[in-house]
């Protein structure tokens, strides 16, 4: 299976910045405790703290599905405080594509890399 990478852009709703950061920590803690195939999960904020960018990498599509299931309600709370746009890199499974259906998602297929 092929690695899957994502870059999530989250525009945090006004007044929700502190709550967003608290729920982000819950997400990180759940990933540490539960995810088996998550290879990268790094959070970044712009200088004013209103936009968050999350870099994620998964061993394969199954690992990304596992991740989404492990976060469940916590991810739902986070997405209730921010507007999401997602870039998805690799060859995501049909299950992933169904899971992100209706979201603002752009998919990019792999072309070249150092390991090719």
Q: Where does each model-flagged region fall?
A:
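Hydrophobic residues embedded in beta-strands of well-ordered beta-sheets
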Residues: 50-52
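Active-site-flanking beta-strand signature of metal-NTP-handling nucleotidyl enzymes
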Residues: 5-11
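An amphipathic, aromatic/His-enriched active-site/gating alpha helix that lines ligand/cofactor pockets
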Residues: 30-39, 57-106
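Hydrophobic alpha-helical membrane-association signature
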Residues: 23-24, 67
């Amino acid at each position: 299976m092929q690695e899957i990478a994502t870059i999530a852009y989250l525009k945090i709703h006004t007044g929700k910045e502190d709550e967003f950061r608290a729920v982000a920590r819950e997400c990180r803690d759940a990933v540490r405790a539960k995810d088996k195939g998550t290879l990268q999960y790094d959070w970044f904020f712009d200088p004013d703290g209103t936009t968050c960018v999350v870099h994620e990498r998964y061993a394969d599509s199954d690992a990304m599905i596992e991740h989404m299931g492990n976060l469940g309600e916590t991810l739902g709370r986070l997405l209730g405080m921010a507007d999401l746009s997602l870039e998805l890199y690799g060859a995501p499974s049909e299950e992933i594509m169904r899971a992100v259906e209706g979201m603002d998602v752009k998919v990019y297929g792999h072309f070249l890399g150092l390991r090719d």
